[in-house]
């Protein structure tokens, strides 16, 4: 049986641009793409923490070190510059692979600099 697990995420990224008339996609700083284990043209989910919007798009590369998170095309209507978003990618694997798999979790500061990286999320307590 195949199951779908979180492969990687950029947590609390700040939207730096919203370009309605650019080809649809999400441009992400190449360094952040690599840290999260994303691939160019990979499908991603965007969860807008500020307004609750959730949508799919795909990754395109922005300049390394730029901190760019740009929602383009129709996705630009789902955000405002400065919104905080979670960008997630998922992968399918069998249960044996899932037992050994660790996601790439990248936590960002407001300026999209890396606060920390990890591969676990602590157990939620009351």
From Swiss-Prot:
SUPFAM superfamilies the UniProt entry points to: ADC-like
Species of the source: Marinomonas sp. (strain MWYL1)
Name the record gives this protein: Aspartate 1-decarboxylase
Gene Ontology annotations of biological process type: alanine biosynthetic process; pantothenate biosynthetic process
Pathway it works in: Cofactor biosynthesis; (R)-pantothenate biosynthesis; beta-alanine from L-aspartate: step 1/1
Family: Belongs to the PanD family.
Subunit structure as annotated in this protein's UniProt entry: Heterooctamer of four alpha and four beta subunits.
Its job: Catalyzes the pyruvoyl-dependent decarboxylation of aspartate to produce beta-alanine.
Cofactor requirements of the protein: pyruvate
Gene: panD
Gene Ontology MF: a single term: aspartate 1-decarboxylase activity
Enzyme Commission number: 4.1.1.11
The reaction(s) this protein catalyses: L-aspartate + H(+) = beta-alanine + CO2
NCBIfam families in the record: panD (TIGR00223)
């Amino acid at each position: 049986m195949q199951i779908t697990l979180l492969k990687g995420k950029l947590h609390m990224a700040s939207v730096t641009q919203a370009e309605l008339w650019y080809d649809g996609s999400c441009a992400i700083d190449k360094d952040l793409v690599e840290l999260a284990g994303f691939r160019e043209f990979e499908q991603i989910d965007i969860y807008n923490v500020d307004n609750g919007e959730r949508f799919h798009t795909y990754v395109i590369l922005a300049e390394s070190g730029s901190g760019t998170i740009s929602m383009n095309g129709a996705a630009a209507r789902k955000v405002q510059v400065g919104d905080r978003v979670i960008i997630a990618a998922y992968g399918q694997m069998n249960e044996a692979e899932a037992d050994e798999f660790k996601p790439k979790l990248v936590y960002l500061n407001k300026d999209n600099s890396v606060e920390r990286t990890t591969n676990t999320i602590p157990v939620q307590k009351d």
